[in-house]
């Protein structure tokens, strides 16, 4: 596996792949990789002749007071995991290499970005779309793989990809969970022992919502109230940032539940904010 840090070197290599007609799979990450990232890399490996992964803690997707400086970093560890997952090229640029000092251009999808995470992180997805656009232009991927844990990001990037004509196949990789149901996240290492003990309750609350839909409940409000009660009882150290029932494509609120609906949440602990979701698609007939 080759590690590249300069965009110009990656651009030159990607040009060679294009001329050779090679299919390229791409997995963008912020590093501190775990088994969830590994699953995305293996998905890409199964769909392309060449696999590129990026490790870049993108400063433009962090807002004031967020955890940019505290976000865990370990490139040596990341390189070992990426190599084991079948990655051919690991791109690990610096912020200075990715952004000109006078950079003033942004890419955003405001209709989808205002919901869910965007309500409390208004500039987050602008940063995500901008850096992914830049990475797409460098890598020229045939297929790009993103985790479904950040469902909103996946929806936004699909829209951006279609609107800007990148022509990349966007694939969503299933959420990978710990044995107790907690969604894998690089930020989980920053939970206190007590918070880590309670954190699986996030997924349990969403599973409760999914079960209520399966049992015939159609009132989203009643379901969300039940999930809030579950969180109050089982995740008392967490503060709900949002808890919503939305259309999986438009991200608009769903009420009543008469079609597949996404239950999505973000919960804040002392030093970390965790997101999770479940798709309730198995509606009673």
Swiss-Prot record:
It is found in: Cytoplasm. Keywords: ATP-binding, Cytoplasm, Ligase, Nucleotide-binding, Pantothenate biosynthesis. GO terms for molecular function: ATP binding; pantoate-beta-alanine ligase activity. Beta-alanine binds at residue 61. One of its GO terms (biological process) is pantothenate biosynthetic process. It comes from the Bacteria. (R)-pantoate binds at residues 61, 153. Pathway: Cofactor biosynthesis; (R)-pantothenate biosynthesis; (R)-pantothenate from (R)-pantoate and beta-alanine: step 1/1. CDD domains: PanC. SUPFAM superfamilies: Nucleotidylyl transferase (SSF52374). InterPro entries: Pantoate_ligase (IPR003721), Pantoate_ligase_C (IPR042176), Rossmann-like_a/b/a_fold (IPR014729). It holds the Pfam family Pantoate_ligase. Its EC number is 6.3.2.1. ATP binds at residues 30-37, 147-150, 176, 184-187. The reaction proceeds by a bi uni uni bi ping pong mechanism. This is Pantothenate synthetase. It comes from Solidesulfovibrio magneticus (strain ATCC 700980 / DSM 13731 / RS-1).
């Amino acid at each position: 596996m080759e590690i590249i840090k300069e965009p110009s070197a990656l651009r030159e290599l990607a040009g060679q792949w294009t001329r050779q007609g090679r299919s390229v799979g791409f997995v963008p990450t912020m590093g501190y990789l775990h088994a969830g990232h590994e699953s995305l890399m293996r998905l890409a490996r199964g769909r392309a002749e060449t696999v590129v992964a990026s490790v870049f803690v993108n400063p433009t997707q962090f807002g004031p007071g967020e955890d940019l400086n505290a976000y865990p970093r370990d490139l040596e560890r990341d390189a070992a995991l990426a190599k084991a997952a079948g990655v051919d090229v690991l791109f690990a640029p610096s912020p200075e290499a990715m952004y000109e000092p006078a950079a003033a251009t942004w890419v955003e999808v405001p209709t989808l970005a205002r919901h869910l995470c965007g309500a409390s992180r208004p500039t987050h997805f602008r940063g995500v779309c901008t850096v992914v656009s830049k990475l797409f232009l460098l890598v020229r991927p045939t297929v790009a793989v993103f985790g479904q844990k950040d469902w909103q990001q996946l929806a936004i990037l699909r829209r951006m990809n279609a609107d800007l004509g990148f022509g990349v196949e966007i694939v969503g990789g299933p959420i990978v969970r710990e044995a107790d149901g907690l969604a894998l996240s690089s930020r989980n290492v920053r939970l206190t022992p007590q918070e880590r003990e309670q954190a699986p309750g996030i997924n349990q609350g969403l599973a409760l919502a999914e079960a209520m839909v399966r049992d015939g409940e159609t009132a989203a409000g009643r379901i969300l109230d039940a999930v809030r009660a579950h969180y109050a009882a089982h995740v008392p150290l967490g503060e709900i940032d949002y808890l919503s029932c939305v259309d999986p494509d438009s991200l608009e609120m769903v009420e009543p539940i008469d079609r597949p609906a996404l239950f999505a949440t973000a919960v804040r602990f002392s030093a970390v904010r965790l997101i999770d979701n479940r798709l309730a698609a198995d509606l009673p007939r």
